[in-house]
A protein has these predicted regions:
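C-terminal beta-strand of the catalytic ATP-binding
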Residues: 77, 167-168
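Conserved SAM/SAH cofactor-binding pocket of Class I
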Residues: 1-85
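Mobile active-site "lid"/loop adjacent to the S-adenosyl-L-methionine
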Residues: 77-108
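Structural signal for short hydrophobic segments within the conserved structured cores
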Residues: 51-53, 97, 152
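Conserved Class I SAM-dependent methyltransferase catalytic core
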Residues: 103-167
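Glycine-rich, phosphate-binding/catalytic loops in enzymes
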Residues: 45, 86-90, 145-146
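Class I S-adenosylmethionine-dependent transferase superfamily signal
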Residues: 17, 90, 113, 117
Length: 168
């Protein structure tokens, strides 16, 4: 299996997948070279085999071909309006680039990844998102409008929408 983590940050999801699924090939993308340097250090220290690449998923300046069985993403999804509700420890340790989206376009990364999934996922490929609890219905609808199947919105331990899954 070939898995892709979009917006990998420190690489924790990609490295966890690699450790849990030793027969899988895991690739991870991020726009931030600084984040990728941390991810590569984590990869080395944890003796993982993830391939990290610097990619801006919002641009079209790279070749796309269907090759992934699974795409996972925990993209930026906190609106600027929600910033005041954030815990100080999150704001102190997470770069703003990894957290925030404009109030006028909070679904920009989801919209782009849904489109990319149509290009990058193999038939029957699976898409997994962590989401802002306020947008579960909108993201599920977006997936439906893009001909994804078996769409599920999964709640976290507090009963809030947190994960969306879908099949190509």
């Amino acid at each position: 299996h070939h898995l892709l983590d979009i917006g990998t940050g420190s690489g924790c999801i990609a490295i966890s997948l690699d450790k849990r699924l030793p027969d899988a090939d895991v690739e991870a993308w991020d726009i931030s070279e600084e984040a990728l340097a941390i991810a590569r250090t984590n990869n080395e220290e944890l003796e993982s085999r993830v391939l990290f690449r610097q990619r801006d998923v919002l641009s079209d300046d790279w070749e796309k071909s269907p090759s992934f069985d699974v795409i996972v993403s925990n993209p930026p999804y906190v609106t600027e309006a929600e910033k005041d509700e954030m815990e100080a420890n999150v704001l102190d340790w997470e770069p703003a680039l990894a957290l925030f989206v404009p109030d006028d376009d909070p679904l920009r990364f989801y919209r782009r990844i849904v489109t990319l999934g149509r290009e990058l996922l193999l038939p029957e490929g699976k898409l997994y998102f962590e989401i802002n609890r306020a947008f579960g219905r909108e993201i599920a609808y977006m997936l439906e409008m893009n001909q994804y199947r078996d769409i599920r919105v999964i709640k976290d331990i507090f009963g809030k929408d947190r994960i969306v899954t879908a099949n190509r």
